[in-house]
């Protein structure tokens, strides 16, 4: 007898992969790569017994597979690559400024234990504060799912993620699914569209069948979105695609293994920032709102479509879905009013606003929607304001190279009377008490 009480004489491949807790494709990959000698019948079928299983276990290091060394070993053996949170192109991404932001907070803010990143994008700045309790939020579901993957506290199986990524990379299909029907030979080749559609459908099915939890679901979707973005026939966004191109790059998913030591009280939201601010409280509110009229839901409509997987009708040359509910007030003439309401409702000790000096340096679409004098007027009513600057070259949708582009940090130390007033009016989740 062996674990589970299954007799060796009656073993089949299903019994073996269940005992080893690996996929069938990975089992055969391991046998082939390591030249593991397993007896075969005249028809080529493997004979499985206790000795064979123990031999394979030694190659797997099965008992310690969650350890980093063994995880790295498995990734290497399967010929996979690992990606990290900063490996994604994104408009306004602050990864290059993360050290500047963290240093500013560490040197000027006291008692910061809870950080709210309410326009979190793909999480570059939130990651800088991963030693704190994090509250992240973004209006785009594709960003919410990425933040959940990286920051929410939920156990997941590294081995399961690695094996599924390996399996997805082996997929070869020409099925006429939603992606192929709507996006073939636009942002991706027809075959890659089929592959994207197949993988996304499989992730959805596995979650609905409870084969993966929501953390694993989020990790797999984020890996797929990152892989798409890496090969997309664009200039970094999805407002348009280049015509008459050869699709040389093929879809390859990388492994994402978020840290499991994040704060157990972290929470990620997918809400309008001005609505969410009324029901949360923290020590530091970090703000990185859209600066100009370019809507993020327009620039990333395809990734948002795949993340949501509601399969809506698409239209126009760029094959966009309806994005009415995803439009941000911060990209319109309402930006200043929205910003003022957000600041008035903020219940924190400090507010840190990232805003560059583009108010009059770019074209009409690039120009900042909120003027410096309005920023100072609004923040000064809330507390004492100090400005910090850093030179910065941003990733944008345009081709212009604007000189003397600076990222400014407006740090507002909230007046004590403001803090007292807000504390009495804020609805706070249970874990804040």
PLM regions: where:
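S-adenosyl-L-methionine
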Residues: 72-109
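Class I S-adenosyl-L-methionine-dependent methyltransferase module
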Residues: 133-135, 139-260, 297-332, 337
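Class I S-adenosyl-L-methionine
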Residues: 372-376, 382-420, 427
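A short, Lys/Arg-enriched interface patch at domain edges and termini
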Residues: 52-75
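Major-groove DNA-recognition helix of helix-turn-helix-type DNA-binding domains
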Residues: 21-45
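Conserved class I S-adenosyl-L-methionine
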Residues: 113-118
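Conserved Class I SAM-dependent methyltransferase catalytic core
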Residues: 329-382
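Polyanion-binding surface elements
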Residues: 2-26
């Amino acid at each position: 007898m062996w674990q589970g009480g299954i007799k060796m004489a009656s073993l089949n491949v299903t019994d073996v992969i269940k005992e080893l807790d690996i996929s069938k494709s990975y089992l055969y990959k391991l046998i082939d790569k390591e030249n593991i000698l397993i007896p075969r019948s005249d028809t080529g079928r493997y004979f499985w017994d206790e000795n064979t299983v123990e031999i394979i276990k030694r190659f797997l290091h099965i008992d310690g597979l969650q350890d980093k060394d063994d995880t790295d070993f498995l990734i290497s053996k399967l010929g996979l690559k690992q990606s990290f949170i900063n490996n994604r192109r994104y408009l306004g991404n602050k990864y290059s400024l993360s050290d500047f932001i963290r240093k500013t907070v560490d040197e000027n803010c006291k008692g910061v234990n809870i950080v709210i990143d309410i326009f979190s994008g793909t999480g570059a700045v939130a990651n800088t504060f991963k030693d704190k309790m994090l509250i992240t939020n973004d209006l785009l579901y594709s960003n919410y799912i990425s933040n959940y993957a990286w920051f929410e506290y939920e156990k997941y199986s590294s081995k399961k993620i690695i094996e599924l990524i390996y399996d997805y990379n082996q997929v070869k299909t020409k099925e006429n699914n939603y992606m192929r029907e709507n996006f073939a030979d636009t942002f991706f080749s027809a075959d890659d569209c089929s592959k994207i559609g197949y993988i996304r459908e499989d992730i959805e099915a596995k979650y609905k069948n409870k084969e993966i939890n929501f953390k694993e679901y989020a990790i797999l979707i984020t890996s797929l979105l990152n892989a798409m973005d890496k090969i997309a026939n664009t200039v970094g966004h999805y407002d348009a695609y280049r015509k008459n191109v050869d699709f040389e790059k093929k879809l390859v998913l990388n492994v994402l293994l978020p840290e499991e030591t994040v704060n157990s009280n972290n929470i990620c939201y997918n809400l309008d920032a001005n609505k969410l601010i009324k029901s949360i409280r923290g020590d530091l509110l970090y703000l990185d709102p859209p600066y100009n009229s370019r809507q993020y839901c327009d620039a990333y409509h395809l990734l948002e479509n795949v993340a949501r997987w509601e399969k809506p009708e698409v239209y126009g040359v760029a094959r966009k879905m309806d994005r009415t509910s995803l439009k941000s007030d911060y990209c319109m003439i309402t930006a200043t009013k929205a910003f003022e309401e957000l600041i008035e409702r903020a219940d924190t000790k400090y507010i840190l606003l990232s805003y560059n000096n583009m108010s009059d340096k770019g074209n009409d679409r690039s120009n900042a929607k909120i003027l410096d004098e309005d920023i100072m007027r609004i923040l000064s009513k809330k507390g004492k304001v100090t400005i910090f600057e850093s030179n910065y070259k941003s990733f944008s949708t345009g081709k212009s190279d604007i000189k003397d582009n600076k990222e400014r940090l407006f740090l507002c130390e909230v007046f004590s009377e403001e803090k007292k007033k807000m504390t009495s009016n804020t609805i706070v989740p249970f874990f804040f008490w």
